[in-house]
Structures are given as C-alpha cells and as structure tokens.
Amino acid sequence: MAKGDPKKPKGKMSAYAFFVQTCREEHKKKNPEVPVNFAEFSKKCSERWKTMSGKEKSKFDEMAKADKVRYDREMKDYGPAKGGKKKKDPNAPKRPPSGFFLFCSEFRPKIKSANPGISIGDVAKKLGEMWNNLSDSEKQPYINKAAKLKEKYEKDVADYKSKGKFDGAKGAAKVARKKVEEEDEEDEEEEEEEEEEEDE
C-alpha cells in the first residue's frame, strides 16, 4: 500500500531545518568520503545554531518564510483533492486553546516588542521556558480559562451537529469568520513551535 499521497506538497521547512541542510551540504563538499554520523552531526548543528547571532540566522529565517509561501500556495492548489478527506467547514467551532497557548497569546507580543527581529523558534523557546518556570498556582488561571473554553467548545460542537453544517442565518458571519481564520493561520506556525516547547 502506498504511503501517503504522492501529489501532496512537500512539507514546509523551518529555519533550523534549512541550517541543518546547509551544514550537511558543507560536510559533503569538505569530506565527500566520510559518512555522516547522524547523532553526532545533529548535536554539532544544534550547538552551532545556539551560538549564532540573529543576523546569521536571518538568512535561514528568510528561506523558511519563502518556503512557507511555496507550501501555502501548493496546499491551496492541492486542497480540494486531499485524499478524499472532507474539507474543513469554516462554520465548525474552532478547537479551544490549551492553558499554555493562552499564556503564549498573552506574552508573545511582549517578547516580540522587547526583542525586535526575534525568530519564531526563539519566541517559542522563551515562552516554553517561561511557562516551565511558573508554579502550579501561577499556571492555574490559564488552565481554568482553557477548561471553560473547552466546555463551551463541546457545547458549540453539540449545537453545530444538531443544527447541521449549513445554517442560512450564519451567512452574514462568514466574512468576519474568514478574517479571523486568516489571522489564526498567521499564528499556526508559531503555535506548532510552541507546542514542541511545551512537550520538551
């Protein structure tokens, strides 16, 4: 059985992935006969990345941004034929954020304003460190809020299913909802990075 969909666009690469790819190419040019020890190579790349300045990382950030544009464009073209998968209904209730994501939403703008030009990965890393340093009592307000949003989401899903997917009265809200979704998409990549930091 074929694995995945061969027509599906290649996934977008992060700035760090482009950096690792560049390191691998450099290694092949300098030592074409020497095989790469993946574990050792990954460790060296990680250490080198941590010591690089924002300016040095910026070219990889630009490469990642360009690749995201490529990926988004290809996914848009690919979208409707996504392996027979049902297209996401824009009227469906949006999955609620976790307590960690609520914390990120509050502090992400503060980190960005305090560190102009900071990369998405570094923002996510800082947020992950800040969250891990909070005590349970400091995390509780975010967790409580997330629990309430989850309750509301479950109720909205039940209402949504009972009313059916298409409700004519909701037509006027579609435009506003679309704008919110577009804004949400901009944060998707940051949230993916933040999710990784929360899991570490």
Curated annotation (Swiss-Prot):
Multifunctional protein with various roles in different cellular compartments. May act in a redox sensitive manner. Associates with chromatin and binds DNA with a preference for non-canonical DNA structures such as single-stranded DNA. Can bend DNA and enhance DNA flexibility by looping thus providing a mechanism to promote activities on various gene promoters. Proposed to be involved in the innate immune response to nucleic acids by acting as a cytoplasmic promiscuous immunogenic DNA/RNA sensor. Negatively regulates B-cell and myeloid cell differentiation. This is High mobility group protein B3. Pfam families: HMG_box, HMG_box_2. Disulfide bonds join C23-C45. The modification N6-acetyllysine is found at K3, K30, K43, K112, K139. Keywords: Acetylation, Chromosome, Cytoplasm, Disulfide bond, DNA-binding, Immunity, Innate immunity, Nucleus, Oxidation, Phosphoprotein, Repeat, Transcription, Transcription regulation. The modification Phosphoserine is found at S98. The keyword Nucleus applies. Its main location: nucleus.
